């Protein structure tokens, strides 16, 4: 019987906690894809440049 008040208090505390949003907050992936495309383009340009002309690799 001594545990009953503690149990009731715990139930009240659990019920009064703020609810948590189940969906994670994520940023829009458009900027991530833009950055990935830009980086891929730079690496691709460097690779093609270095195949034909070595001096231009420093400038890209």
Curated annotation (Swiss-Prot):
A single GO cellular-component term from the record reads: extracellular region
Q: Which residues form the propeptide?
A: 23-45
Please describe the organ and tissue distribution of this protein's expression. Answer: Expressed by the venom duct.
Query: Is Signal set as a keyword in this record?
Result: yes
**Statement: the UniProt record of this protein carries the keyword Lipid metabolism:** no
The protein in question is named: Conotoxin PnMRCL-022
The record's subcellular locations are:
Secreted
What is the recorded post-translational modification? Contains 2 disulfide bonds that can be either 'C1-C3, C2-C4' or 'C1-C4, C2-C3', since these disulfide connectivities have been observed for conotoxins with cysteine framework V (for examples, see AC P0DQQ7 and AC P81755).
Q: Which taxonomic lineage does the organism of this UniProt entry have? A: Eukaryota, Metazoa, Spiralia, Lophotrochozoa, Mollusca
At the top level, the lineage of the source is Eukaryota
Q: What is known of its domains?
A: The cysteine framework is V (CC-CC).
- Keywords of this protein's UniProt record, alphabetized? Cleavage on pair of basic residues, Disulfide bond, Neurotoxin, Secreted, Signal, Toxin
| One MF annotation (Gene Ontology) recorded for this entry | toxin activity
Signal sequence span is 1-22
Q: What is its main location?
A: secreted
Similarity annotation: Belongs to the conotoxin T superfamily.
């Amino acid at each position: 019987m001594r545990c009953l008040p503690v149990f009731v208090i715990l139930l009240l505390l659990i019920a009064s906690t703020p609810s948590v949003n189940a969906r994670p907050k994520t940023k829009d992936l458009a900027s991530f894809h833009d950055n990935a495309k830009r980086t891929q383009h730079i690496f691709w340009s460097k690779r093609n440049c270095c195949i034909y002309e070595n001096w231009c690799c420093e400038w890209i």
